[in-house]
């Protein structure tokens, strides 16, 4: 969003980011309400926490709480890598005792780990929700969280299950097909519920999906998620663009008794589950390194 607002101008991106932090004391995007996460080195541990945490000064960690609520000071913006949504800065942040974090593992490059940890909640929730034999639809399957969810969904659904990936562009469709995590991959506009519903009906012989996981960060995809899911199925909205009103009234309007879950960026063990995916799948690790690290 900031890149779009700045017209791709890196100096303008830096100016917007510095302005946000200067005004709010944290990096909370006033348009989206979200903020990202950070990778940093522990400089000091509060006296009351010394000996009660597994951290020590000098440890490299990724914070798993949003920068929208992390006290932050930016002294200097050193490099902006808009293609991978990462910014290098000199600065300081405060992580509270309740703030969750992950130590950067020795066996994975920092930027690779950071790119996956940024969306760790989605694949970990997928691991919790998907059962053997489930038919699962991933909307936004070609993106960062989408690819991780596809891998995890296939792992959990097993040979008796079915994973369907819905991508936006032809490029992301081809990329996901090559990865081989999905039984079916197709390209469609997720804001158009009826054509997508018809395609899912065709792929599932009219049975529809047990679980739909929505990773698309655009508005108006609520009805697509609901209509593609069985009446007693489950929709997981990981997308920050989800409208409670559209989802609730939409399901009511079409007489769907679907269970809807608001995506929580945290679930127990989410960092470990997500990093383990990169260790297990060479194809996933390779594509994440190429695209995001």
Please tell me what each predicted stretch does.
Residues 49-57, 130, 229:
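Short, well-ordered loop/turn sites that connect or cap secondary structure elements
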Residues 216-281:
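Glycine-rich phosphate-binding loop and adjacent beta-alpha segment
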Residues 144-145, 220:
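Hydrophobic/small residue at the entry helix of a nucleotide-binding pocket
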Residues 154-220:
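Adenosine-nucleotide cofactor-binding segment
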Residues 14-32, 36-39, 48, 61-133:
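NAD(P)H dinucleotide-binding glycine-rich loop of Rossmann-like/cofactor-binding domains
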Residues 206, 276-293:
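C-terminal capping/lid region of NAD(P)-dependent oxidoreductase domains
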Residues 136-142:
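Conserved N-terminal Rossmann-fold NAD(P)-binding element of oxidoreductases
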